[in-house]
Amino acid sequence: MRIQAIRGVKDIMPDEIEKWRWVENKANQVFTRYGFKEIRLPIFEKTKLFSRGIGETTDIVEKEMYTFEDRGGEKVTLRPEGTASVVRAFIEHKMYTKQTVQKYYYLGPMFRYERPQAGRFRQFYQIGVEAMGTHNPSIDAEVMVMLMDFFNILKLKKFELQINSLGCNKCRPAYRETLKKSISKHLSDLCENCN
């Protein structure tokens, strides 16, 4: 019996590598131009980092993480996303003591136990950015402009930038109440998990 790749993962063959390197190099060029520095993150972390960071009741934590016990009995998880690991590294290495705004980007494989289908794999590659140390919304605008630059360099033709906001710390409680009132009219339409 031949051993094949596990369902939901994909080999990146030599004829595809140049395209991957080109995208990664363009990401590096664009992000460093905006002052973002690359950070390389571990492939696996303590499970509690993701359950705390992403939220214990999210689909990612409840259904999609690859979690196992290591030989020492510690629960570890293959990273499902990069944000929690960046925050952990930021705190662990006291990066908050360096300068006010810290800007990082990462790229690499992520892992989620999802039903494989077109464009959705259990091991997938993600490029992400994180900016910490400021509540100024101008950093969000900078990230959006930077990503538009990146997408244009990649010559992506069909993409749409959609912007959403939960509001600032002062306005967020009123926003939540308005949202709750709006949703309460439709609670009977929601499943048990969402209700």
Annotate each language-model stretch with its function.
Residues 1-195:
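TRNA-recognition modules of translation machinery and tRNA-sensing kinases, especially anticodon-binding
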